[in-house]
Swiss-Prot record:
SUPFAM superfamilies: Small protein B (SmpB). Residues 139-154 have a biased composition (Basic and acidic residues). This is SsrA-binding protein. It comes from Aliivibrio salmonicida (strain LFI1238) (Vibrio salmonicida (strain LFI1238)). Required for rescue of stalled ribosomes mediated by trans-translation. Binds to transfer-messenger RNA (tmRNA), required for stable association of tmRNA with ribosomes. tmRNA and SmpB together mimic tRNA shape, replacing the anticodon stem-loop with SmpB. tmRNA is encoded by the ssrA gene; the 2 termini fold to resemble tRNA(Ala) and it encodes a 'tag peptide', a short internal open reading frame. During trans-translation Ala-aminoacylated tmRNA acts like a tRNA, entering the A-site of stalled ribosomes, displacing the stalled mRNA. Residues 137-161 are annotated as: Disordered. One of its GO terms (cellular component) is cytosol. One of its GO terms (biological process) is trans-translation.
């Protein structure tokens, strides 16, 4: 009798992360979306050749798209397919989720940011964050808080010795 495969941790299926988004924006909510991909793009994702740091998500004609996501084509890709690494890709969500995002972006002055790309079984998914931009003083406050937490941990560690 064959053993069942143990379920992987969510972090182990991560393809790419946008760490810059947490620095530049207050992310209030995250929603999972599928991505419309071509065959060569899936192969490149499996080898980890993707960058979502410079990507942005926008709404057009009641649909949500991601632009600026760079998927580098493999050398062994098919010769009869023209690979465009930065093409605009459609994000796949339910109509209810799309309407909710459109309403929040238009009404509350929020923006949409791609935060993480990961695998769910054999499908590539993107977490889209509903975010508000940080001002310079917000970034300074975050930096001070991060430094204080680091110093606090250092003090606690030395006091336990």
């Amino acid at each position: 009798m064959a053993k069942k495969k143990s379920k992987d941790k969510a972090g182990s299926n991560t393809i790419a992360m946008n760490k810059q988004a947490r620095h530049e924006y207050f992310i209030e909510d995250e929603i999972e979306a599928g991505v419309e991909l071509q065959g060569w793009e899936v192969k490149s994702l499996r080898s980890g050749k993707v960058n979502i740091a410079e990507s942005y998500v926008y709404v057009r004609d009641g649909e949500i798209f991601i632009s600026g996501m760079n998927i580098t084509p493999l050398q062994a890709a098919s010769t009869h397919v023209v690979a465009n690494p930065t093409r605009v890709r459609k994000l796949l969500m339910s109509r209810k989720e799309i309407d909710n995002l459109i309403g929040r972006v238009n009404r509350e002055g929020m923006t949409l940011v791609a935060t993480t790309m990961y695998w769910v079984r054999s499908w590539a998914k993107i977490k889209v964050g509903v975010a508000k931009g940080k001002k310079l003083h917000d970034k300074r406050t975050d930096s001070k808080e991060k430094d204080w937490n680091r110093d606090k941990a250092r003090i606690m560690k030395s006091s336990l010795r």
